[in-house]
Amino acid sequence: MSEDKHGKDSGGKLLYCSFCGKSQHEVRKLIAGPAVFVCDECVELCNDIIREELQESASTGADKLPKPKEIKKVLDEYVIGQEKAKRILSVAVYNHYKRLRAQQTHSKKNEVELAKSNILLIGPTGSGKTLLAETLARLLDVPFTIADATTLTEAGYVGEDVENIIQKILQKCDYDVEKAEQGIVYIDEIDKISRKADNPSITRDVSGEGVQQALLKLIEGTVASVPPQGGRKHPQQEFLQVNTANILFICGGAFAGLEKIIRSRSEQGGIGFAADVKSKDDSRNVGEVLADVEAEDLIRYGLIPEFVGRLPVVATLEELDEAALVRILTEPKNALVKQYRRLFEMESCELEIRDDALGAIARKAMARKTGARGLRTILEHTLLDTMYELPSSERISKVVVDEKVINGESEPLMIYDNSLEKQAAAAD
């Protein structure tokens, strides 16, 4: 049986909706299926039911959103110190995703519109900026990507276009646009795109101020056109439309020299009897000075005012001291010492790194000014020869590392177990 364009079958019989029973004259459209018909009103009703269920599931999902204290607790497991930064991040991320859930469940026109709060992380190299962003994304189970600001240029110049950032986050979630629109983007080395001078340049600054201008709309929220599956742009192809309004952008940078700008501002006083006289003897460390950063300092450093305005949440990280670096070596879930012990266990060998060795590793990293990032390099260099020999020797049961080994004054102490050699010979 076939239906003509007026809703009657080929025999001229009047047709009815199989669900609500309305005739073809009572509805706008009647859709035919195998021996059944459905009207446009029933289709719309089904859509409403599904939409309500999706909103309900979104609201129940909001209950699963970890609270700020829970977020900080997870950050504590991976990041040592930086208490203030972790609190700021926990609240900012919680509010961001709470805003997203509110958009999904409430669509009233007269409701208060919640603005997006992107984050700026300021801290020395190896202080934990990238690790904080990675841990947040893993906790929230959202797509996460890292972009290097130093490779970005204005559109039309050699280098990466800012829209490549959206390309990267799409790749992380197999080009699922809806999922990508709720992700986190960490832009590293953001201080490297600062304007080269305080005054706007006459010549074009394609990797500095030009990139800041290009990032403005992307960070605030725009619909970016991205080629599907990472292809090149050409006029005949269809683009994926990605709305960046709900993507959380976290920008991080060391901002070397920013502390001098902050100190010069804080040392300035008034004139006359009402002047606020301030001492020039500022014994605070870099981290303590950076904690006093204000928007005008960032603008003097070289960020344009519009860009600073798009990053309302600012968290500063402290420089890691020896005690913090020792804790980083041993305490986090994925601590380096735990990782190397596990590698040695897989060779049926115990690794002991003594306390004086941990202190020596921390001091070396501080001398190199690489922060926590340099700890792995030092350990890898120290244990390289041992890890080279270990798989070929079945007698080594324990390796001991002390301060002299770290300083290059002696080799790691290897303890041999002759019973292991006998067991190996018996097995042969």
From Swiss-Prot:
Which Gene Ontology cellular-component terms appear in the entry?
HslUV protease complex
Family matches, as Pfam families = AAA_2, ClpB_D2-small, zf-C4_ClpX
In this protein, which residues make up the domain named ClpX-type ZB? 4-58
Looking up Gene3D superfamilies in the UniProt record yields: 1.10.8.60, ClpX chaperone, C4-type zinc finger domain, P-loop containing nucleotide triphosphate hydrolases
Residues bound to Zn(2+) are 17, 20, 39, 42
Q: Which UniProt keywords apply?
A: ATP-binding, Chaperone, Metal-binding, Nucleotide-binding, Zinc
Q: Which GO terms describe its biological process?
A: cell division; proteolysis involved in protein catabolic process
GO terms, molecular function? ATP binding; ATP hydrolysis activity; ATP-dependent protein folding chaperone; protein dimerization activity; unfolded protein binding; zinc ion binding
Give the residues the record marks as binding ATP.
124-131
The similarity comment for this entry is: Belongs to the ClpX chaperone family.
Q: What does this protein do?
A: ATP-dependent specificity component of the Clp protease. It directs the protease to specific substrates. Can perform chaperone functions in the absence of ClpP.
Q: What HAMAP family does the database record attribute to this sequence? A: ClpX
Q: How does it assemble?
A: Component of the ClpX-ClpP complex. Forms a hexameric ring that, in the presence of ATP, binds to fourteen ClpP subunits assembled into a disk-like structure with a central cavity, resembling the structure of eukaryotic proteasomes.
Q: What is this protein called?
A: ATP-dependent Clp protease ATP-binding subunit ClpX 2
